Amino acid sequence: MSRSRTNGNFIDKTFSIVANILLQIIPTTSGEKEAFTYYRDGMSAQSEGNYAEALQNYYEAMRLEMDPYDRSYILYNIGLIHTSNGEHTKALEYYFRALERNPFLPQAFNNMAVICHYRGEQAVREGDSEIAEAWFDQAAEYWKQAIALTPGNYIEAHNWLKITRRFE
């Protein structure tokens, strides 16, 4: 039985029902349907905190999915898992790969900025202000890109940019 059929989460069940209806209505190849099934099961596992299972599903979805736009969301979700696991270098790599395929993912820019800001704070704690400033500058660039894509979102980032005089 597919993982998504056993999930007790109402939102996931609703998403699965709608997704299954769309897969029946919209003309898609069997490979596209299979890729989406793996993606959907990956999201279900990820929402339950089963990251290893989610990654397996996402990697299988990546093997089958050919559309760059759809691949960008798979890569983004893989980045989220690496972020949650504290694997920031890997997370940045996957966010970057997602943005190569879809440059209109403000959430990827935001997550990259958060990681850079975190690394900047680590450098401050270690007494390396030069490295900290470089990380903060990089965070600022990513937040500017996220804000440019979705004006009105990322209010805290916008305020940080103003306070630190990094907003142009």
From Swiss-Prot:
Membrane topology value: Peripheral membrane protein
Entry's Gene Ontology cellular component terms: chloroplast thylakoid membrane
GO BP: photosynthesis
Entries under SMART domains matching the protein: TPR
Domain of life: Eukaryota
Transmembrane annotation, as ranges: none
Keyword Chloroplast among UniProt keywords: yes
Compartments where found: Plastid, Chloroplast thylakoid membrane
Gene3D superfamilies in UniProt: Tetratricopeptide repeat domain
The keyword Lyase appears for this protein: no
TPR repeat positions: 35-68, 72-105, 120-153
UniProt entry keywords in alphabetical sequence: Chloroplast, Membrane, Photosynthesis, Plastid, Repeat, Thylakoid, TPR repeat
One Pfam family cited in the UniProt record for this chain: TPR_1
Matches recorded under SUPFAM superfamilies: TPR-like (SSF48452)
Family annotation (NCBIfam families): PRK02603.1 (NF002725)
Chain's role: Essential for the assembly of the photosystem I (PSI) complex. May act as a chaperone-like factor to guide the assembly of the PSI subunits.
Family stated for the protein in its record: Belongs to the Ycf3 family.
Stored HAMAP family: Ycf3
Protein name (database record): Photosystem I assembly protein Ycf3
Source organism per UniProt: Plantago lanceolata (English plantain)
